[in-house]
Design a protein with these regions (language model features):
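Acidic/charged, solvent-exposed loop-and-adjacent secondary-structure segments enriched in E/D, K/R, S/T
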Residues: 100-102
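DNA polymerase processivity clamps
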Residues: 1-94, 109-167
């Protein structure tokens, strides 16, 4: 299986939410922050043949980046990463799912009111800001993405203006 650039970008974005991940059989990927206050779900074009866990998603993505055109072959206990016409290969072992933070239930999201794209860099920046100021909440309001503590009106916050269509 080859991973599309869109799927690689989804995984990069998810790595900013949580460094570990369980990918279930199928084409839906979801993650949850360690504090369990951020949940993300994406449907990708690939269909994963089996469920597997990755302990360090950034490391996994770095291993994939060692190949120009990686081919992933999902085995029982590891994924074999190769490249056609190359002598390179990597055996990347799956993690024990019990040590990985993952949503325990299927995420059922309400119908969307607003949709927008957010870059990996922007998500990384806002997540870093939340960590720096200790903000547990992320709020999208009036085209701005803000991290803050909604329970504390005098809490520090950090805001990024986004290009979000007005409804």
């Amino acid at each position: 299986m080859k991973l599309s650039s869109q799927t690689i970008n989804v995984l990069k974005n998810f790595s900013t939410i949580n460094q570990n991940l369980v990918i279930k059989e199928g084409s839906s990927i979801s993650t949850m922050s360690a504090m369990k206050n951020i949940i993300a779900k994406a449907t990708v074009e690939e269909t994963f043949p089996k469920e597997f866990a990755i302990y360090d998603l950034n490391e996994f993505l770095s291993v994939i980046s060692l190949f120009s055109n990686p081919e992933l072959d999902f085995k029982d206990n590891f994924v074999l990463i190769t490249e056609e016409g190359s002598s390179k290969s990597s055996k990347y072992w799956y993690s024990d799912p019990s040590v990985v933070t993952t949503p325990t239930k299927d995420i059922t999201m309400p119908s969307t009111e607003v949709t927008f794209d957010i870059s990996s860099d922007t998500l990384s920046e806002i997540t870093r800001a939340a960590s720096v100021i200790g903000a547990p909440d992320m709020v999208l309001e009036n085209g701005e993405l803000k991290v803050t503590d909604k329970k504390n009106t005098t809490a520090n916050d950090f805001t990024l203006k986004l290009d979000v269509p007005k409804s």
